[in-house]
Amino acid sequence: VTLANHSALENTIPPASHPEFKETGCFLKFCDEVRRYTSVPLCGVGGLNDPDFVEQQLASGRIQCAAMCRQLLADPNWVNKLQSGNAAKIHRCVRCNKKCLGGLIAHQGTRCVYDALNAKEQGSI
């Protein structure tokens, strides 16, 4: 369950300054609304960069799946770091859209401002 404005690519993937995208789990309120009408499993998305918060939402049953895109670009080893007890080392997406959306718009591929840090860490988990 998500929110998007497809009038322009820049509006499809909202930056941190977007009025609906200010808090962690910002779109989960839409899951809450959908839940009123169905009991099917719901996948939440939107600013899910805090592993403790994500775990709380899953454990409470608010969502049954957590979807992440930019967060996994920011740190492809997010799950591995959690499993190895290194959650504090996770590079959290800052929703700047500089290289992820910016790369798409410039036809340069999908990247992240953390790419250099991730490359340096590769294999060190």
What residue ranges belong to the model's regions?
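Flavin-dependent oxidoreductase catalytic cores
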Residues: V1-I125
